[in-house]
Regions:
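Conserved catalytic-site loops of classical short-chain dehydrogenases/reductases
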Residues: 5-7, 45-51, 95
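Catalytic helix-loop patch of NAD(P)-dependent Rossmann-fold dehydrogenases
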Residues: 20, 27-35, 46, 55-97, ...
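Short, intrinsically disordered, charge-balanced linker/junction segments flanking boundaries
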Residues: 1-2, 115, 166-169
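Active-site loop/turn elements of alpha/beta-hydrolase fold enzymes
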Residues: 11, 52, 99
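NAD(P)-dependent short-chain dehydrogenase/reductase
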Residues: 85-132, 137-146
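Mid/C-terminal beta-alpha module of Rossmann-like enzyme folds, strongest
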Residues: 143, 150-169
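Conserved sequence/active-site signature of Rossmann-fold short-chain dehydrogenase/reductase
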Residues: 55, 102, 131, 166-168
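NAD(P)H-binding glycine-rich loop region in Rossmannoid oxidoreductase-like domains
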Residues: 1-30, 41
Length: 169
């Protein structure tokens, strides 16, 4: 077997649409993750899985710690937490990396929308009921590679880790 690691960045991430498509969201964010974990475990591979801060209720005045109790308030958050739990159940030798406000020049994300609207409109209005740290996808990729490098050095430590860039907006 040549497979040592599986990196899973796939997910149903349309947070608002998830409320209307709970079954599909659960099949992707929980069931597919469980299947991936089972397949990886069967061949002795370790899984590095990307998750989200939506597993929390978002009411903390400080950054969440890995040891904080989860309490998702949305379908998306509940399905991502269910995926974490399913993965650790079938493939406990896994790393889960929770991140927040992920953005890049690719795909759909809040930062790209703001930049596009900034070009189209003279004025932008925002609700300001959330505080968070935007995380560049490239930085998350570097963090995931660091997990692989540690694993190759014999220092793979399964568990849940939080990663985001610095700063707050």
């Amino acid at each position: 077997n040549d497979v040592q690691y599986v990196m899973n960045c796939a997910a149903y991430t349309a947070v608002d649409k998830a409320e209307e498509h709970e079954d599909l969201c659960m099949r992707i964010n929980r069931d597919a993750v469980r299947n991936l974990g089972e397949a990886a475990h069967a061949v002795g591979a370790k899984v590095i899985h990307v998750s989200t801060d939506y597993v929390f209720d978002g009411t903390s005045c400080r950054p969440y710690l890995e040891s904080d109790a989860t309490c998702p308030v949305s379908v998306y958050g509940r399905t991502k937490l269910a995926g974490e739990q399913a993965l650790m159940e079938v493939c406990p030798d896994s790393v889960i990396i929770r991140t927040a406000w992920l953005y890049s020049e690719y795909g759909n994300n809040f930062m790209k929308t703001v930049l596009r609207l900034g070009k189209e409109r003279d004025e932008l209005r925002f609700i300001f009921d959330q505080v968070g740290t935007p995380t560049y996808a490239g930085d998350l990729a570097v963090a995931m590679l660091a997990v692989l490098e540690r694993a190759e050095a014999g220092k793979f430590i399964p568990g849940i880790y939080h990663f985001s860039d610095e700063g707050v907006c």
